[in-house]
UniProtKB/Swiss-Prot annotation:
Residues 30-96 form the Importin N-terminal domain. The keyword Nuclease does not apply. InterPro entries: ARM-like, ARM-type_fold, Importin-beta_N, XPO4/7-like. Signal peptide: none annotated. This is Exportin-7. Pfam families: IBN_N. Keywords: Cytoplasm, Nucleus, Protein transport, Transport. The gene is XPO7.
Length: 1087
């Protein structure tokens, strides 16, 4: 250890400095010294001394965290004996010191949990030494309340620890441990926890006694952790709370068939203080969500009846629900009533009529108090949305009574939102309309609720809209109207326009009637009349929120009533014709385009409105029939002939705006490109006419670049806007004829300008990202649009430009030096990722014969590939998987390289080859299926190449192996562990995981086995021997069947046979292991 960390006193002083000092420099110095201490050889013994003799809680905390790091490390792990000693020491330490500082106790319990988890499969004398967890805590549970709290916390923390995957160990190992813990210990822990809770609820708990208080809290946490366990390894996304089913194992059935378990939590809810209730309700949420298949129909009905009774009791005594946490959890519980049970089952519950009345009243009251716990409203609306959606399908004879209650819920939502407007404006409160994501989520739910008893919904909306619209019109005509009154009516109309859009969007074709379509017509007429009024005032004033509501309405209207699938005889169109003279879809489309042009004219500097307006235009341009109708409109022809900043201000160069604000231009030109293509054909004059503004922009930038002094900001803005426009056009031009016009326009005239921009501004991603993205789009052979004539060299010329851009950018970006971690993606990795995508698109586009480059001494291909390697080696492995876009672009490029350019891969330096193989090895266990599948494909190509080269080297051939192949073989023979590790990983995933891409995994496996037959044999024996004696023969037979009829070659027929064998093998192994109490105790398989 370093000289300055000599004694315990010094260590304690460093801890004090680390946790207590306010001086940053002192803290950093202490942190550095303590990191050295953690990495020192005598750290373990010093930690024990700190725990034994340390005088401060901070030194005990340091010892516990250092020990946790030591037992967690994957390289140079601690021996088994040492870990057993640490585990026993920690238990004794906690037992003899029940009054430690809370954070020290917590850290020591974390240490125990980590040792137990990581050692779950460790054996000593045929005994799993870390599995006696209940025995470990029994002595705590039989002692004082403080000891009891420690014992319960140990179980709670252990359950939590085993449930959480960590990045330092493979996911396969985590799932294996979690499954074994679930099968061997979790139910006993849950039962123990429930029994202790029953004892606690049976006594008159003295909740003024803090220790009793703490015990109850820890028991509830433990129970919740048991119920929240990821039983089958599917909860990768914990942020989602929808359609959640708790996959309780069948062996737990008895606990849930016993009604006293459910009753326990409802009794606890009513008998303990409100501060504990949220945890009780969280447990009830999980219990209510147990999988349906755990019960038969009669059992489920009985369970549901008890559940509904408990909910009814809470609703009849709602005092505790005034606590926001209680209220939130109770709303979640209500939502689970419908997500896990069918309406047909609910209506058969004895108290259903009373309960649905209570829930409706509770919902209406909640909606009226809109300012209280707004995040909980989602769950209530979710319940009613699911109830309403089930009405057409319910077959039960019992009345569901939703025709009575859904209109009440709809009315409460609508009126409460309107009433909130005045209060929010008066008191300066946060406006829910500012959170468009939340508003949209609620409106999606309301769209289904509102369509139930739609006549009542429409009548209410018409009445409220007419009142607000009339008041609004009167205020606008009055000279004395206050701005506050105008703002209130605009706020109310904003909500109404949003809601009308939502209920129209909720139309379901098979359940709609002519009468309902006519009602939609009534609502649409009113919104369009309001639009005419507000548009006429835009020169003086406009309301951004109301405009966004209008765009939301137009988007819903487009989805339902415009397009190829809509019946034109709809009653809606008849109503539009009667009131507004809009006789058909073409006339309605002209209204859309008129609104789009108006918005772009008046709101060109308002990014939210501009981007949503352009998205609407883009969506309209996709439809086959609508785009053909649009082109005939004079307004669209105006856009095609006048797309300049003079008419559309957002196309201008605004020095105040951010460069990234120009993103919407790509959307605009994608739509214009589609519209232009409808009648373009081979008309080059029309094309050149359309491109005039872009030609002028390119000439302006070229002029600037030709002088030594130019306005850099203006040049950047002009160029960035231009390349964003061009990318939109390039994306839209997916036919050969139109794309060739674009290609011949940009090459060779303007390509040097793009290259010059990369040279000048490589360090500014706001400039390089749009340029690189344009190039990536130009080389993408979308819909086979890049088909050059046989006499044309354009394919090769295009690749030369691609190579030049990648090389220019790559070599310069590597000169940036150290980039801060929080900026590394924006400044460096994003551009590299686009370069990888660009190179992949060019290499896989099938419009270049890459063999000619070497033949004619052209270094374009070699330069691009060498730059790829330089860029790759500048990226840490962890970053490759941490940034999803980078992962996908890298692995898809690597797939193409291993498939078509394996000679290049084989020619790389040993450390580069090992880097690439390591990245494949890590990618095999990635959560992203695309990445994992790509890695399988890369590995298959490499293994196939290796196998072929090995086969050739053993045969007498007239053509010897190339120098690259020979070297590659030598490297692989020098480092067999990398390929062996991947064989182990692939086999592990296939046997133990929910393998979603089994076919992809099977392809490299045969090659891996044939290249490593001895290793595979050892691996197989290890797996077989780890099974209990009575299972070993069956497992041995599984492996025999896997290789049945497989020859020593990688021909397609042999591969297909192996893939079939592997499917059967996976089934048989899973069946064999289902009833096995043992796991696979193989270091190869587990590490």
């Amino acid at each position: 250890m370093a000289d300055h960390v000599q004694s315990l006193a010094q260590l304690e002083n460093l801890c004090k400095q680390l946790y207590e000092t306010t001086d940053t420099a002192t803290r950093l110095q202490a942190e550095k010294a303590l990191v050295e201490f953690t990495n020192s050889p005598d750290c373990l013994s010093k930690c024990q001394l700190l725990l034994e003799r340390g005088s401060s809680s901070y030194s005990q905390l340091l010892a516990a965290t250092c020990l946790t790091k030591l037992v967690s490390r994957t390289n140079n792990p601690l021996p088994l004996e040492q870990r057993i000693d640490i585990r026993n020491y920690v238990l004794n330490y906690l037992a003899t010191r029940p009054k430690l500082a809370t954070f020290v106790t917590q850290a020591l319990i974390q240490l125990y949990a980590r040792i137990t988890k990581l050692g779950w499969f460790d054996c000593q004398k045929d005994e799993y030494v870390f599995r006696n967890v209940i025995t470990d805590v029994t002595r705590f549970l039989q002692d004082s309340v403080e000891h009891c709290i420690i014992g319960v916390t140990i179980l709670s923390q252990l359950t939590n620890e085993i449930n959480q995957a960590d990045t330092t160990h493979p996911l396969t190992k985590h799932r294996k441990i979690a499954s074994s813990f679930r099968d061997s210990s979790l139910f006993d822990i849950f039962t123990l926890s429930c029994n202790l809770l029953k004892q606690a609820s049976g006594k008159n708990l003295n909740l003024n006694d803090e220790s009793q208080h703490g015990l109850l809290m820890q028991l509830l946490k433990l129970t919740h952790n048991c119920l929240n366990f990821d039983f089958i390894g599917t909860s990768t996304d914990e942020s989602s709370d929808d359609l959640c089913t708790v996959q309780i194992p069948t062996s737990w059935r008895s606990a849930f068939l016993d009604s006293s378990t459910l009753q326990l939590f409802f009794d606890l809810y009513h008998s303990i203080p409100p501060s504990f209730s949220p945890l009780v309700l969280s447990c009830l949420v999980q219990i209510a969500s147990v999988r349906r298949s755990l019960f038969n129909n009669a059992e489920r009905a009985k369970f549901l009846s008890h559940l509904v009774d408990g909910v009814k009791r809470i609703l009849e005594n709602p005092q505790s629900l005034s606590d926001p946490n209680n209220y939130h959890e109770f709303c979640r519980l209500l939502a689970r009533l419908k997500s896990n049970y069918q309406l047909g089952e609910l209506v058969k519950v004895e108290n259903y009529p009373e309960v649905i009345r209570l829930i409706a009243n509770f919902t209406v009251t909640s909606l009226q108090h809109w300012e209280f716990a707004p995040n909980s409203v989602h769950y209530l609306l979710s319940l009613w949305q699911r109830l309403a959606a089930s009405v057409p399908y319910v077959k039960a004879t019992e009345p569901h009574m939703l025709e009575t209650y859904t209109p009440e819920v709809t009315k409460a939502y609508i009126t409460s939102r309107l009433e909130s407007v005045h209060i929010i404006l008066r008191d300066g409160l946060e406006d829910p309309l500012d959170d468009t994501g939340l508003v949209q989520q609620q409106l999606d739910q309301l769209s289904t609720i509102g369509r139930c008893e739609y006549e009542k919904t429409c009548a209410l909306l018409v009445q409220l809209f007419d009142q607000s619209a009339q008041s609004y019109q009167e205020l606008l005509q009055s000279a004395t109207a206050s701005p506050m009154d105008v703002a209130v009516q605009e706020g109310r109309l904003t909500w109404l326009v949003y809601i009308i859009g939502a209920v129209i969007g909720g139309r379901v074709s098979f359940a709609s009637t002519d009468e309902q379509d006519a009602m939609d017509g009534e609502l649409v007429c009113r919104v369009l009349q309001l639009m005419n009024l507000t548009d006429s005032r835009l020169a003086q004033a406009g309301n951004e929120k109301l405009e966004l509501a209008m765009l939301s309405f137009f988007e819903q209207f487009r989805k339902i009533y415009i397009g190829d699938q809509v019946q034109k005889s709809s009653k809606l169109y008849r109503r539009l014709s009667e009131v507004l003279g809009l006789n058909d879809e073409t006339m309605v489309l002209s209204v859309f385009i008129g609104k789009i042009i108006t918005n772009l004219k008046y709101w060109g500097r308002c990014e939210p409105i501009t981007s949503k307006t352009l998205q609407l235009l883009n969506d309209l341009s996709i439809g086959y029939s609508s785009v053909r109708k649009l082109v005939k409109l004079s307004a669209v022809q105006f856009m095609l002939n006048n797309h300049t900043s003079e008419h559309f201000s957002f196309l201008g160069i605004n020095n105040q705006s951010n460069l990234t604000d120009m993103r919407c231009r790509t959307t605009f030109y994608t739509a214009l490109g589609r519209l232009l293509m409808v009648d373009l054909g081979e008309d080059e004059d029309q094309y050149e006419q359309f491109m005039l503004p872009l030609t002028a922009a390119f000439e302006t930038v070229a002029q600037m670049f030709s002088t030594n002094t130019f306005n850099e900001q203006e040049a950047k803005r002009t160029l960035v806007g231009l390349v964003r426009d061009l990318r939109g056009i390039a994306f839209a031009f997916n036919a050969k004829t139109s794309f060739m016009m674009l290609f011949e326009w940009i090459y060779p005239s303007y390509m040097p300008i793009l290259q010059r921009a990369i040279e000048l501004w490589y360090h500014d991603p706001a400039c390089t990202t749009p340029v690189l993205k344009l190039m990536a789009e130009l080389v993408h052979n979308r819909s086979q649009r890049l088909q050059f004539d046989v006499s044309s060299p354009n394919g090769i010329l295009l690749f030369r430009e691609t190579s030049k851009m990648i090389t220019t950018y790559g070599n310069r970006i590597l000169t940036l030096g150290e980039v801060p971690k929080d900026q590394v993606y924006a400044l460096k990795l994003k551009g590299i990722s686009i370069c990888f995508s660009m190179l992949k698109a060019a290499l896989s586009g099938s419009y270049v014969n890459f063999g000619v480059f070497r033949l004619y001494g052209d270094d374009a291909l070699d330069n691009a590939l060498q730059t790829f390697i330089k860029l790759l080696l500048s990226i840490p492995h962890s970053d490759l998987l941490d940034y999803p876009k980078l992962s996908q672009s890298y692995y898809s490029l690597l797939e193409v390289l291993t498939q078509d350019h394996m000679n290049f891969i084989a020619s790389l330096e040993p450390h580069v080859i090992m880097y690439i193989l390591s990245s494949i090895s890590e990618g095999l266990t990635a959560l992203d299926t695309m990445v994992c599948t790509g890695c399988c494909s890369c590995l298959d190509h490499i293994v196939t190449y290796l196998f072929k080269q090995l086969s050739r080297s053993t045969k007498k051939r007239t053509t010897p192996l190339t120098q690259e192949s020979d070297r590659f073989l030598h490297i692989m023979q020098q480092h067999p562990e990398m390929i062996q590790q991947m064989l182990s990983t692939v086999l592990n995933i296939i046997i133990f995981e929910d393998c979603r891409n089994q076919w992809s995994m099977s392809r490299p496996l045969l090659g891996l086995i044939l290249l490593n037959e001895k290793y595979f044999s050892d691996l197989r024996n290890s797996i077989v021997n780890s099974q209990p004696p009575e299972k070993q023969q069956a497992m041995h037979l599984c492996f025999e069947n896997l290789m049945e009829g497989i020859e020593r070659n990688l021909l397609t027929k042999n591969r297909d046979r192996f893939t079939q064998n592997l499917s059967a093998f996976r089934r048989e192994v899973n069946d064999s292991m289902k009833n096995s109490p043992y796991g696979v105790n193989s270091n190869d398989m587990m590490s």
